[in-house]
Regions:
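Glycine-rich anion-binding loops of enzyme active sites
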Residues: 53-56, 61-63, 91-175, 286, ...
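Acidic, Ser/Thr/Pro-rich beta/coil linker or hinge segments at domain junctions
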Residues: 2-4, 275-315
């Protein structure tokens, strides 16, 4: 029914995670227009070092999450950075961090980072710690080596195929919109996050974005934003983990979920590589030049965002 699609679109657009992305516009206000690849805008910035491309990125973790679950926040700090590096088609090399809080909070954060470091096979090589009795903060930063052309959102273009690559094994947290897969996926996650660099090096995929705090459709809108491409997504084409509602899945931060684009004819190679690792591959359609991200139930269609007149990040 059309009213259900309208309600779904309204729920997505009004979610705190989507609305929070609008604050990124202050970066443009201060630093000026972004070229997306070497400035603010993409999942990571590309820095050329000795003829090699290095991806640099960083993440700040929600203070309320650090207070509630410092160990989980430490895990998330590594996860978010590793996924950002992967989304650029790079192999993660190292993590550094900044931690502020009471002694036991800092210990729990670092223990979470140590756990995730082992899971993803990425060392935590340094950082900064400030002991504070009444303040908590956590940020982490990563570098990665990009062996091929970066999977930048600037490479998104009409005619490319769009797919969701994801791990559907996991359990949704009750307190925060996170879908961890560590118990279910374990050490396979280290290879999972390196898959995108392999697909990029083989020329299979053109661009990518990890599904993060903006949720599935917010992340997709951000992928389409720099080149003003459009897409029509059939809601029944989106795979959803068992025991999770579509609405919760659409708004959560999964442990492993990436939106990827590729040239027509590359879908089979991408699918084989993804499913060969036991991950889910879901084709979501073909990108167009409309600048509109639309949702459809195959009978009715609603516009979630028209990037010709609206913006997600303001960059």
């Amino acid at each position: 029914m059309v009213h259900e699609l309208v309600d779904l679109a309204a729920m997505i657009r009004s979610s705190p995670a989507w609305r929070a992305k609008g604050h990124i516009a202050v970066v443009r206000d201060v630093f000026g227009p972004s070229d997306w690849l070497r400035g603010p805008g993409d999942d990571g910035a590309v820095v050329t070092v000795g003829g090699e491309q290095v991806i640099a990125c960083g993440e700040a973790i929600l203070p309320a999450f650090v207070e509630r679950d410092p160990h989980g926040a430490g895990v998330a700090a590594v996860l978010a950075n590793v996924n950002d590096v992967a989304a650029m088609g790079a192999v993660p090399l190292a993590i550094v961090d900044t931690v502020v809080g009471p002694h036991e909070t800092c210990r729990a954060v670092l223990d979470g980072m140590r756990f995730a470091s082992h899971v993803y096979d990425v060392p935590v090589v340094g950082g900064h710690l400030t002991n504070s009795a009444d303040r908590v903060a956590l940020s982490a930063f990563a570098v990665g080596r990009c062996p091929a052309r970066p999977l930048s959102a600037t490479r998104v273009s009409p005619g490319q195929r769009l797919a969701l690559v994801a791990c559907l094994e996991g359990t949704m947290r009750a307190d925060f919109p996170f879908f961890p897969s560590f118990d279910e996926r374990g050490g396979d996650l280290a290879g999972d996050v390196r898959l995108l660099a392999q697909l990029a090096a083989e020329g299979v995929i053109e661009a990518a974005k990890d599904v993060s705090m903006a949720g599935l459709f917010g992340s997709l809108a951000m992928l389409l934003e720099p080149t003003r491409c459009g897409a029509t997504i059939a809601v029944d084409a989106v795979p959803v983990p068992d025991g999770v509602t579509f609405e919760a899945w659409a708004l959560c931060f999964p442990c492993f979920a990436f939106l990827v684009t590729m040239a027509p004819g590359s879908e089979d190679r991408c699918r084989r590589a993804v499913e060969g690792r036991g991950l889910s591959y879901a084709p979501l359609g073909t990108l167009d030049g409309s600048a509109a991200l639309r949702l459809t139930d195959r009978s009715h269609t609603v516009v979630l965002i028209d990037l010709n007149v609206d913006t997600v990040t303001g960059l």
